[in-house]
C-alpha cells in the first residue's frame, strides 16, 4: 500500500513506524527569500527521523537550489550519492536579473545508505 503525506514533516515524522518508508521526497525551504515560510529547517533533526523511518534500502530525494544545495549536501555528505539537474522551461529571478543570471534549473539530490532498486533508463544522447 502506498501512503502519501502532505504536511509539515515535523508533525508527522515522529508518528511513523521505524523502518517503514521506502522513499522521502522533500522540497525543503531554500532560505533564498525573507519570507517566513522560507526559513532553514533543522536538518539534523530531519536526518535523525529519516534514518529511523527509512527501510534499509530507502532513499531521500530532495529538491534544492544554490546556495541551499551546498547546505543540504553537507548535512549528510556520507549518504549523498548523486545529483540530477531539473531544467526548467521558464527561468525565475526576474527581480534580480540586473544583478545575476536568472535561475533556469534546480538540483535534485539523492541520498541513501544501501543501494535501492535502480532501473537504468537509456535516453538519446546520454
Residue ranges and their predicted role:
Residues 1-126:
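Core catalytic lobe of class I
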Amino acid at each position: 500500500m502506498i501512503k502519501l503525506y502532505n504536511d509539515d514533516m515535523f508533525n508527522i515524522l515522529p508518528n511513523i513506524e521505524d523502518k517503514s518508508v521506502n522513499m522521502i521526497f522533500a522540497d525543503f525551504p531554500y532560505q533564498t527569500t525573507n519570507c517566513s515560510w522560507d526559513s532553514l529547517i533543522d536538518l539534523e533533526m530531519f536526518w535523525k527521523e529519516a534514518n529511523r523511518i527509512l527501510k534499509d534500502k530507502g532513499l531521500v530525494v530532495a529538491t534544492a537550489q544554490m546556495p541551499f544545495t551546498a547546505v543540504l549536501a553537507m548535512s549528510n555528505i556520507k549518504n549523498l550519492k548523486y545529483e540530477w539537474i531539473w531544467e526548467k522551461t521558464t527561468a525565475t529571478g526576474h527581480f534580480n536579473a540586473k544583478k545575476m543570471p536568472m535561475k533556469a534549473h534546480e538540483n535534485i539530490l539523492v541520498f541513501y545508505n544501501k543501494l535501492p532498486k535502480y532501473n537504468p533508463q537509456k535516453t538519446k544522447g546520454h
